[in-house]
Amino acid sequence: MKKILLGLLLVFAFVGCSGLSTKTPETITGKEYVLSTSTDTVKITINFAEENFFGFSGVNNYFGKYTLSGDNMKLSHVGSTLMAGPREAMEKEFEYVSALEKVETYQLQRDTLILTTSSGQQLIFKQAEKPELKK
């Protein structure tokens, strides 16, 4: 009887301790990220919700669907509003949206989100700071 109880105690101890080492992966949803090459005048952003992503690409708002599998990310069905803007801004926006369509992997390191394309290009975002509410 003592051996059975000791065996059960060991099983419960191992099961109980195994839960301590598992980490909940950080999520990318519900946060706004700003492209690190953004300027004060043009802030390129990306946000993630359930299966959708959206943001501002310098001139237009954009949106689409995404899927995650481990470190792999697929952005699809990318669309945007159709506003016109300065030529340079439109060219940068085109390059950015084209890169989004080629994203294959992602990394989340604290407040930094790195999207890597099939050609190895990295889009590095910082989590946007939430504005303080004035009292």
Model-derived regions, located:
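Lipid interaction determinants
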Residues: C17-K135
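Sec-dependent N-terminal signal peptides
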Residues: I4-F14
